[in-house]
Amino acid sequence: MRLIKIIILLLLVIGCKKKKVTESTSTVNTHLKNGMMVLCEGLFQQNNASISWVDFSNSAIDNQFFTTKTGRLLGDTGNDMQPYGCKIYIIVNVSSTVEVLDKSSGNSIKQISMMNNGIAKQPRSIAFYGSNAFVSCFDGYIDVIDTTSLEVIKRIKVGLNPEGLTVANSKLYVANSGGLNSPKMDSTVSVINLTSLEEYKKITVGKNPGAILSDNQGDVYVISRGNYSTISSKMVKINSVNDEVSAIFSEEISGIEKMESNLLVTYKSNANSVRKVGVFDVVNEVISVPELIKGTNFTTLYGVQYRSSNQKIYCFDAMNYTNTGFVKVFSSSGILETSYHVGLNPSKIVFYE
């Protein structure tokens, strides 16, 4: 009788262990909320791009979020991450893939291979319009991806090594950097008609254009990064009605982010100063708040992202590009409130309410 009781107890213990495995598996499908997904680029050719999940309710951080969800690595050099509809699209440059995740759960939907006859296209950035996603590829094309089938349906020839993308007035603006062709860099922005899906114009904006965005008035701003030595970076404004350059700003601006009706800019006051974050007034075309966030808050200021729902500014600190980085959160008046220790070279955030 005692032996039978022991056997029954063992069976109960085994049964409980199986339940725990099932419960653990079910957490993979938990709906994500009240947090942020952070893309960390990793280091070039080290295959260590990653995604961090930060839970705002308890400040818990999972720096292996993508691997936990998929059972594999994200890849080499994650350059962009954007939500659209019920999906999140992640651009992995050196691996030449676009990872598509279910936004609600973070689970993988599809990995899109970005190869052309065995040659890497090297995707860089992504933007959306209607039922299509547009991916800039370093081989000189914009790939059009159907957001339902998740297949590449067209390639549009543009300039050298296209990078940043933005949509304004039913047109796609493409910053052609030519960064891989130094010293013979590109200096143009391609304009693509989003009805015909054809390039119809190139606008000269200055050497090595990279980041680009449109404001609430429909004007387009692009950063021409120069040659990193004798030619400094600058910001150029494009009128999206006539597609002509309407203003060039003298400040050494290297980064831009939309903040309500104005822009956040990262810039240097002079060649010897550290980069800081200011506010650019798009109506009066001046930096109205020269030092909203001091550069001394960072080891390596890598970028800025604004969250309109709470009016907070999220700054990326890359920590000299070799140590795992931080997302530092500031109030709209520039006060540091908190920071989160994430992966290597954080650069993009998708927020969850």
Where are these regions (language model features)?
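Sec-dependent signal peptide recognition
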Residues: 2-9
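C-terminal motif of bacterial Sec signal peptides marking the signal peptidase cleavage site
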Residues: 12-15
